Amino acid sequence: MPKVGMQPIRRQQLIEATLQAVDQVGMGDASIALIARLAGVSNGIISHYFRDKNGLIAATMGYIMSMLNEGVRARRQALTDDSPRAHLKVIIEGNFDASQVNGPAMKTWLAFWASSMHQPDLHRLQRINDHRLYSNLCCQFRRALPLYHARKAARGLAALIDGLWLRGALSGDAFDTDQAIRIAYEYMDLQLAKQER
């Protein structure tokens, strides 16, 4: 009989082992056996908690996305300035948070994006994440710009954030968070300046 309260601990242990496995060998070679070994559990535990490897991958991405949302939320709560610019800055910073630009997270994101084109559950998660970023950006730009320009600015900034993240992840060097944030801020400021015209 399982110990009461072990499920959240065990699930987190398996998610962290999945991140470690993907970092070490990639998504394709991150077998259930390897993940279980890294977590120090039997293979059957993964099936018990997640059904299969796809369920574990979806849970791992859910965890990474929740870390992204938490990074933005924590920054938003610390704001003393309620301007659209301040809110846009925390969205940008949250997307380049250490939880999103470390090796295991970046490799898992990259593998997730590739897999999401073929697996409906992962595709659904990707659409949710994409819509959340766009919606949050559009909401803040809308406070300063007409709807058409707000939508256009939100699409552009979302694409820039993803592009900067992707280039940083694929560079092979340490992710230059400061540079990525500076470039995104410059784009944001160019868009917000349109309200003054």
UniProtKB/Swiss-Prot annotation:
Keyword annotations: DNA-binding, Repressor, Transcription, Transcription regulation
Domain named HTH tetR-type: residues: 8-68
Gene Ontology terms describing biological process: glycine betaine biosynthetic process from choline; negative regulation of DNA-templated transcription
Signal peptide annotation: none
Annotated DNA-binding residue span(s): 31-50
Annotated PROSITE patterns: HTH_TETR_1 (PS01081), HTH_TETR_2 (PS50977)
Gene3D superfamilies: Tetracycline Repressor, domain 2
Pathway: Amine and polyamine biosynthesis; betaine biosynthesis via choline pathway [regulation]
Function text: Repressor involved in the biosynthesis of the osmoprotectant glycine betaine. It represses transcription of the choline transporter BetT and the genes of BetAB involved in the synthesis of glycine betaine.
PANTHER family reported for this sequence: HTH-TYPE TRANSCRIPTIONAL REGULATOR BETI, HTH-TYPE TRANSCRIPTIONAL REGULATOR RUTR
Protein's name in the database: HTH-type transcriptional regulator BetI
